[in-house]
Amino acid sequence: MKTTLKKPVAIVGYSGHAFVIIDILLSAGRLVTAYCDQEAKEFNPYHLEYLGKESDVINKLKKFDFFACVGHNGIREKIHTNLSQYLGNPINAIHPSAVISSSVKMGDGIMIAANATLNPLVEIGRGVICNTSTSIDHEC
């Protein structure tokens, strides 16, 4: 897949949930090149560069778009809040196979996985995870 001329992406958190996010971003043409986590991961299936803990590498992260790849809602929100004050808002990860009505309102830092459907007038807030084949009907 062709990549865009946008900044490369650094992910925050690098385990199971991150692998899904990376696949979505790659499918959408984004280049994912680095990650932040509490420590370097021995298992690095996407061969990403380890930048360090996100709180220690704010200046390094400025050359990237970022996405918080943490499944825990509270921790993900904390990462969004902390990093947004230095880096702007996180990007969205939307799989190309998702069906999204033009009237859907979306926050930032959301994940919409493969084959998800978001129907008219749906509102998705910041950091929401819509997993594989999620279906959200109208006006929800």
Please state what every model-predicted region is.
Residues 1-45, 51-59:
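Hydrophobic, well-ordered beta-alpha structural blocks that scaffold small-molecule cofactor pockets
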Residues 22-25, 78-82, 124-125:
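Short amphipathic alpha-helical segments
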